Amino acid sequence: MTTIMLVRHGRTAWNREERFRGRVDLPLDELGLKQAEAVGRRVAAAWQPAAVYTSPLRRTQQTASAIARACGLETTIHTGLLDIDYGALAGLTPEEAAEQYPALARAWRGAPHTVQFPGGESLVDVLRRAQMALAESLTSHPAQTLVLVTHVVVCRLLLCAVLGLDSSHFWHFEPAAASISVFQISPERNILLSVNDTCHLAGIGA
């Protein structure tokens, strides 16, 4: 049985502003850097991962590097862990998106699995490559503990997939910045151990 630690990256300025981020290559802000160090300490203290995989974007690489340093590992980049491509909506606030793309914004909140972002991706696209990244990591490290550092959209989709839920349940999960969700995978069954664990962030501000 392989244990997967699914980590969302630390906070960025656009997380504070609630903008559509996607492929925009944002760095962690000051709090996000502290969150990354905290999640690194937590992983090193509680688990012994064999590998740390990360999306290639800067915010995830910064978070993954903090975890890898704490665990004495190197990071491995996998493009399958990239955030969704929001296309024309990248950089917009929810209010701006609702004004410029009202039908799309309503669908995104009410039926996200039906949305194709103009010039971007759908949840089907993201899930396909995220599952490929997960499968490749499982093949490379059978019966070990792995860290996957990625984005909120990928976290939601993989949590749905692990529980056998389709992407219409996307909004049922709300992984916080620098949160850890843990599940185990075997040929017989998937077991969800924890979701959105942020106890390591206590006392570092918000």
For each feature predicted by the language model, list its residue ranges:
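Active-site-proximal alpha-helix that buttresses catalytic centers in soluble enzyme cores
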Residues: 2-3, 11-77
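Short, active-site-adjacent cap segments at secondary-structure transitions
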Residues: 13, 59-61, 83-85, 154-156
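Phosphate-handling substructures
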Residues: 27, 69-131, 184, 191-194, ...
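Short beta-strand scaffold positions
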Residues: 54-55, 128, 149-150
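Active-site-adjacent alpha-helix immediately C-terminal to a catalytic or transition-state-stabilizing loop
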Residues: 61, 69-71, 132-191
